[in-house]
């Protein structure tokens, strides 16, 4: 039944945790401030699917969702950088638009159009983060660049394939 919402995903970590959890202690070892972040990936296609590779703020009190599932916003100090968010329904025929976002500022949201279907083959998606600048790349070509304040602290990497209805489309 396509009208039933279904949330499932494959991801590297559950980013909704408290500072005392074992998972938080492990992620602390992999968090960093600034650098080059890269993945070679073949994205999936299909409505209701979201390919995602992103950085999340290291501080568990500043995450987009609380451990109880309540959503916070930019005013609450939430920091997230989307290296790539590609909806499975946005293949070459539907525009192949990639979301590239810096979630702590109103001026850091980009919708970039690529002239290829990301589900047809592997591509290298990357982001360079330095003080005052964040730039996004695909196969070595710069897609977008944000100039302005950058996140003040360490962040950790998350990678996921989500199945969900709503803003990413009804599930096929």
Functional labels for PLM-detected ranges:
Residues 1-172:
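GH16 jelly-roll
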């Amino acid at each position: 039944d396509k009208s039933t919402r279904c949330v499932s995903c494959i991801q590297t970590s559950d980013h909704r945790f408290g500072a005392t959890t074992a998972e938080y202690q492990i992620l602390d070892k992999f968090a960093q401030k600034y650098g080059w972040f890269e993945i070679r990936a073949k994205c999936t296609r299909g409505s209701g699917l979201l390919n995602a590779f992103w950085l999340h703020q290291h501080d568990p009190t500043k995450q987009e969702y609380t451990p109880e599932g309540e959503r916070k916003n930019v005013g609450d100090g939430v920091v997230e950088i989307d290296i790539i968010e590609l909806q499975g329904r946005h293949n070459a025929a539907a525009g192949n638009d990639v979301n590239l976002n810096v979630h702590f500022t109103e001026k850091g949201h980009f919708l970039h159009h690529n002239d290829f279907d990301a589900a047809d083959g592997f591509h290298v998606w990357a982001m360079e983060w330095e003080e005052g600048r964040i730039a996004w790349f695909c196969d070595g070509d710069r897609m977008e660049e944000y100039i302005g304040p950058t996140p003040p602290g360490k962040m950790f990497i998350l990678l996921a394939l989500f199945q969900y209805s709503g803003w990413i489309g009804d599930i096929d």
